[in-house]
Amino acid sequence: MQNSESLKINYHKKRFQVVSNSETGEVDSNTLFHYSQQDDVLWAVYQGSKIKLGTITGLVKEDNSLEFSYQHVNEEGKIRSGKCTSTPELMEDGRIKLYEKWSWDGENEIGESTVEEVLS
């Protein structure tokens, strides 16, 4: 486990998979996230399991943490959105793990999830 603040993380072309999620979340281990980054702007596309298609738009902070909004269409045809902050950890094998705290817009539901980088 390494401190991610000692080096700048570039999330461009990284893929992430869910390893844990709160009960009120809709993503799971079958959901795959494809990240892109330009300067401090982050965006991603995700899908799989209960998610037909989702997008993320946000910022990479100086400490490598992420702040973003997400929205997706789920398998029930509902559009859902929310906000998330993610704190990175560099794992011993060099992959990135993100600890996420999120909330749904317009609802009093909050949760936490963890995603890990998937190597090609």
List each model region and its residues.
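Mid-chain, well-packed structural core segment of small domains
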Residues: 60-96
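Short, solvent-exposed aromatic-acidic interface loops
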Residues: 48-53, 72-76, 102-108
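Short hydrophobic/aromatic-rich beta-strand segments that constitute the beta-sheet cores
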Residues: 18, 42-44, 66-70, 96-101
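N-terminal first-folded block
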Residues: 13-50
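Tryptophan-anchored aromatic micro-motifs
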Residues: 2-27, 98-104
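Hydrophobic/aromatic beta-strand elements that line small-molecule binding cavities or substrate pockets
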Residues: 30-36, 55-59, 82-89, 115-118
